[in-house]
Design a protein with these regions (language model features):
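N-terminal Rossmann-like NAD(P)+-binding domain of SDR-like oxidoreductases, especially those catalyzing
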Residues: 1-170
Length: 172
């Protein structure tokens, strides 16, 4: 858990957690992890939605983060087939809200979750960050590729250093 690691190794760092606590993943697991984090005096949890622009702006206005790590998104390739609205709201509108907040309340760096899904139907293995990613095979992948393009544009237009992490699904 990234937040726990930061709280344990950087005791003077304030960590703000935002989660809508939806039930795509088991809420009891989220609540158990949240209970561990709330033991730290320098941890603040806010239950809310990335797509709530007013909330995002108020968080940035109140806390003025130096570094933003956005791991929030609606996950799951298959779920995107039957629930496209959830992906547009969280992965596009929510990410746009984060980018806009980073623009209006300048940050040192934005780190965000992308996905290996951006490689789409690429048959070449191993994958490389130099591979073309212009052939998504799901709405989820398209939203993650869009995030990368949006972050790149904001980085160039508004000088927001950003790093996208293309996570792979873990089996086991």
């Amino acid at each position: 858990n990234l937040a726990k690691r930061i709280l344990n190794t950087e005791p003077d760092t304030k960590v703000i957690g935002l989660d809508n606590m939806n039930d795509y993943y088991d809420v009891r697991i989220k609540e158990a992890r949240l209970a561990e984090l709330q033991k730290f005096a320098n941890y603040t949890f806010i239950q809310g939605n990335l797509a709530d622009k007013e909330l995002i702006n108020s968080i940035f206005e109140q806390y003025h983060p130096d570094i933003v790590v956005n791991l929030g998104a609606q996950a799951g390739v298959r779920y995107s087939i039957t629930n496209p609205d959830a992906y547009i709201e969280s992965n596009l509108i929510g990410f746009y809200n984060i980018l806009e907040a980073c623009r209006h309340y300048p940050v040192e760096h934005l780190v965000y979750a992308s996905s290996s899904s951006v490689y789409g139907s690429n048959k070449k293995v191993p994958y490389s960050t130099d591979d073309k990613v212009d052939n998504p095979v799901s709405l989820y992948a398209a939203t993650k590729e869009s995030n990368e393009l949006m972050a790149h544009a904001y980085s160039k237009l508004y000088n927001i250093p950003s790093t996208g992490l293309r996570f792979f699904t873990v089996y086991g």
